[in-house]
């Protein structure tokens, strides 16, 4: 089986404001980049908001298969775009296993 990277997404920490006025620091909004350098702490240019639960050498990257991406859309009854912003947890890139 071979894996092919279809999309790479990275994000920076920003303050999100919810409808009730509460605010939250998160890097959940990811954008597509053409390439990225990978090191022991993850992808250059990608950050995480809750460092206690995300990131670090044991959680540096997150891969999601193409099938899982489609199943997640179906489960949530959403139509998240592969190439647009991503607001689902730490989704870093989508891969297709062949």
Curated annotation (Swiss-Prot):
This protein's name: Uncharacterized protein HI_0279
Domain of life (superkingdom): Bacteria
InterPro entries to which the protein is assigned, alphabetical: Benzoxazolinone_Detox_Enz, MoCF_Sase_C, Pyrv_Knase-like_insert_dom_sf
A GO MF term: pyridoxal phosphate binding
MOSC domain mapped to chain residues: 30-98
PROSITE patterns registered for this protein in UniProt: MOSC
Record GO biological process: toxin catabolic process
GO cellular component, one term: cytosol
Gene3D superfamilies from the UniProt entry: PK beta-barrel domain-like (2.40.33.20)
Cystine crosslinks: none
